[in-house]
Amino acid sequence: MNSVQLPTAQSSLRSHIHRPSKPVVGFTHFSSRSRIAVAVLSRDETSMTPPPPKLPLPRLKVSPNSLQYPAGYLGAVPERTNEAENGSIAEAMEYLTNILSTKVYDIAIESPLQLAKKLSKRLGVRMYLKREDLQPVFSFKLRGAYNMMVKLPADQLAKGVICSSAGNHAQGVALSASKLGCTAVIVMPVTTPEIKWQAVENLGATVVLFGDSYDQAQAHAKIRAEEEGLTFIPPFDHPDVIAGQGTVGMEITRQAKGPLHAIFVPVGGGGLIAGIAAYVKRVSPEVKIIGVEPADANAMALSLHHGERVILDQVGGFADGVAVKEVGEETFRISRNLMDGVVLVTRDAICASIKDMFEEKRNILEPAGALALAGAEAYCKYYGLKDVNVVAITSGANMNFDKLRIVTELANVGRQQEAVLATLMPEKPGSFKQFCELVGPMNISEFKYRCSSEKEAVVLYSVGVHTAGELKALQKRMESSQLKTVNLTTSDLVKDHLRYLMGGRSTVGDEVLCRFTFPERPGALMNFLDSFSPRWNITLFHYRGQGETGANVLVGIQVPEQEMEEFKNRAKALGYDYFLVSDDDYFKLLMH
């Protein structure tokens, strides 16, 4: 698979108009897509009207599924641009100076760089963990928040700060405000679990619950900032926030014992990887800076692929700490010039890495906190790396307790130690016994069977496996006995919903199958029913909570083909994210 060739970036961080021997004003940290014209005039000059600003280009909206590649493969590799090769030395020094002179250690610790002995032995490399989960708020986020806030003028800080967040950034801002003696308002979605907003409140901040989503909370926070004179503290897209996160890279280069092959960094909005790259690539350019994203929340990979920032039309919410639809402007500018590519990992792999960390250090990471570890392991396996030093940043440990159920269910699947299978079995005496004999000594961890009126039934089951050959041998035994067997392990639809709905097949006509994301708040179900019932008959409903990001709901609705346009209009008006899965082969196998 070839690396993606990106168009050359226009190099201009500083846009200004000036005349010889006149003062010059420079504005840093604006991309070439948002140029600002500035006229600096002496007293004897007449006023000059700058050209009208160009309207911003509409952002490209894309699906996460439009860019997928094998686990561990280093994709979305940007071509080095002229800006990267001949970038401003002054700009590079600005970030380096900011990082080196930071005051984040007023509040943050220098987190340890620990060897993961069990993982290192299993992979044949020296795997080091940068333990940002050990920070006072169990996340790296306080570094960037504090670095920006401590630099605010005293009069501005006295007015207070505001931010929007459902998690780690909120705690970072709240703790920083407490340290600096200023007020902080934290706007969080109403779907935020009580344990999270109470943790922020306990740090002394004022919590405002607003909106069903982060976007709504952010919009409200920015309005309040404007109306009340508060300073908005962004979660990632600000030079001082980026520099604060960059101290992680500074520490790694100081703590590393021997040359590093790569540093694996979880990517959401891009603040952490931009900061690390801004430092490490200037002092140790040979070290690879590799981003890791969930396969269903790959905004950075897609932005690098298209050569511009894009917006995801949907974003997976399991790793909620990195579940963003759009990366930052400044973070993208730095990342496309300095990072080496992106590794994509599945939810199963993230769960496996949470288990790896528990077995290694007896600590439980949140999904986003285990993301880099999952990417590092997949990368080492894919490229067959041996005897090199790699670092994975364990970025956070604010685990939502409700998600532990999902983690325990999927961890062995992610380790490729468990497989989910379906076998078609004839409805006749003795067939069940024959099936069990063919499974043989393999451990069955889950088994679902329901007698059907049809000539054959579907058995859904999970088995423990030690090698890929063992699984292939089982499938071969089944097929040789005329029992068709399908491996369903990679299907999220099966693992989230269909495995719990084994009550027999249905012959319902005109059934439209959809996966909706319901906000976790009272009244969400009734809002849904008001949109579709009694207009159409609901034929299937399965709810699966995933924590604060919302509930994953599988819905079947009888909608005649000629009424599909009306159905889509009602679904759009409802405002819940959804997509159609009616044509899924596994749904047809198990349910129809």
Swiss-Prot record:
Where does it live in the cell? Answer: Plastid, Chloroplast
Gene from which this protein is expressed? OMR1
What is the superkingdom listed in this entry's lineage?
Eukaryota
Quote the function comment for this protein: Catalyzes the formation of alpha-ketobutyrate from threonine in a two-step reaction. The first step is a dehydration of threonine, followed by rehydration and liberation of ammonia.
Protein family per UniProt? Belongs to the serine/threonine dehydratase family.
Its required cofactor(s), as named, are: pyridoxal 5'-phosphate
- N6-(pyridoxal phosphate)lysine sites (modified residues): 141
* Name recorded for this polypeptide: Threonine dehydratase biosynthetic, chloroplastic
The record's Gene Ontology biological-process terms are:
isoleucine biosynthetic process
Query: To which pathway does this protein belong?
Result: Amino-acid biosynthesis; L-isoleucine biosynthesis; 2-oxobutanoate from L-threonine: step 1/1
Q: Might you give the EC number(s) for this enzyme?
A: 4.3.1.19
SUPFAM superfamilies on file: ACT-like, Tryptophan synthase beta subunit-like PLP-dependent enzymes
Task: Transit peptide: give start and end.
Answer: 1-91
Q: How is its activity regulated?
A: Allosterically inhibited by isoleucine. Strain GM11b is isoleucine feedback insensitive and is resistant to the antimetabolite L-O-methylthreonine.
- What cellular component GO annotations does this protein have? chloroplast
Lineage of the species this protein comes from: Eukaryota, Viridiplantae, Streptophyta, Embryophyta, Tracheophyta
**Transferase among the record's keywords?**
no
